[in-house]
Amino acid sequence: IIEAVKNALNPDAAEEAGMPFEQPDVLVIGAGMAGLTTAARAAELGLNVLIVDQAATYGGSANVAGGTLLGAGTRMQKEAGIEDDPDLCFADFVRLGGAGNFNEEIAREFAEISGEAVDWLDDLGTDFGDRVPYYGVYQPLNVARNYSGKGGARAFVVSLYAELEKYFSTNAYMMLNTYVTGLVTNDEGAVIGAKARLADGTETTLLAPATVICTGGYAGNEELLNKYNFENVLSTSPACVTGDGYAWLEELGAPLTNMDFCTAYAGGIPTSDDFRSFGYFNATNGALWINTNGERMANETGADSHVKSETWANAPHNIVYTVFSSEMLIPDAKVFSTGAWGSVKEEFDPYMESLIEKGLAWKADTVEELAEKVGLPVDTFAATIAAYNDGCANGNDPFGRTAQEVAMANGPFYAVK
């Protein structure tokens, strides 16, 4: 192993020291937040730890994630006068996740140790900003037990790496640019390490009594997203989040469960040919959501992000058209955003023209013409708009909508895919 690591040395580590042990006790695959947590804690406990990652840097998706943690009974809750315990935390898991939809034994263990884990990160000097727990944004918890790192999840990466770095001269080592190709098993079928390819193409085997797979999800893998979740999907995940660990475990006969569960935002517009690049269109007051059959699907103004996501997930081909008229445009709106904090103000007409040129938007003088341009069933779409307009006039929207009832009476009309 010592020879194998020479070409994959972490530039932030003490290069001159080399790997401080001949054989690791623990091999950690993946240097994102889970891997850094595992490696740092194992090193604290005195184990020899080798952590590897296919990327050129550590942190994984935590380098770009918003950075929210959950913990029950934490020091920060006590400081804020908030009473909480693992039972209340577990009750939230059942309420929000649905009994039977998750491994309750693991969830119970998570609830029991979550507060201690958050306090440990606090002890490491993590910058939690104002240190005020909160309920959550989309589906509020029963107790304020969410915490955010200042500046996002990168705050956690910084403190975890700093803790792990303390042990680089004694019992921890990191190999980046190291692509694991599969797991190694003994004659009894137990995992005893991994096969890996270094940056220079060298193939090697990394052995350890314990192997911990911390390769994260698969949100950067379009093939797996298409297979398990969505026919059409965009992602902001880093390219390194490929879900390789699932394939390794499946090869060994491990059952994969709940792979069809994926929390996703709705309404992305591609900004390049890379499926990991998209943004949102924001400039309307009460636009309609129309599926590929030319039909509405929900009360657009009464839907929270969860309902909106469900609407997109259940739409044919996961495609929805945001349809609106010029009367629905918000003057001086921030037309486009790349996330919750990335809204930008653009001139509407040039931006819309750019979408039209890319085949992502259409403009027409009549509802029927718009349907023809988009490729929607003309009669169905026209009837949908007529029913919406009747609802605006009579106060009886087909989906119970009572807000932002702006009739689509006059063109031009627009559709954004």
Which residue stretches match the model-derived regions?
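A glycine-rich dinucleotide-binding beta-alpha-beta segment and adjacent secondary-structure elements
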Residues: 182-184, 190, 380-417
